[in-house]
Amino acid sequence: MVKIRLMTINDWKGVEQVWKDHEGTNPVDDCEEGFTRYLKRNPATSFVAVDGDRIIGTILAGHDGRRGFFHHVVVAPEYRKKGIGEDMVKHAMEALEKEGIQKTALVVFEDNDLGNGFWEHIGFTTRPDLVYRNKYVK
């Protein structure tokens, strides 16, 4: 039976495996050091879905004090379409709300039809008035 629980630093190996099995993650950004730093800054807002001892889903969630952010919402292919992603999002939204966060955002690749369909299905809207930009610090 699949259960949703708080993500911990000790989950790194299982989380890393789920991310490696999923397109769209970046080994430069998604290293153990970055994962640990993120969870230390946001200790109560990220969750994993587990089936027995196996991590089969992740939602890395946090905030900057005013806006929540979701990263790497991933469910192993054989577990998709069973409500697990929605359950993880619900847990993360409730955790963010407890910390006083009213709104959350995320980035999805434009050609990720499965991901975009999921977010639309659960009520997330696109912002055609925004352009996403980034730049490496060094």
What are these regions (language model features)?
Residues 86-87, 98, 110-129:
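Conserved active-site alpha-helix within GNAT-family acetyltransferase domains
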Residues 106-115, 134-137:
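Conserved beta-strand-loop-alpha-helix junction that forms the acyl-donor binding cleft
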Residues 37-48, 69:
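A short helix-loop-beta-strand connector motif used in the catalytic cores of GNAT acetyltransferases and
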Residues 96-108:
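Conserved GNAT acetyl-CoA-binding A-motif
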Residues 62-71, 80, 126-130:
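A conserved beta-turn-beta hairpin within the catalytic core of GNAT-like acetyltransferases
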Residues 75, 81-94, 121:
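Conserved acetyl-CoA-binding loop-helix of GNAT-fold acetyltransferases
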Residues 2-15:
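A short beta-loop-alpha structural element at the N-terminal edge
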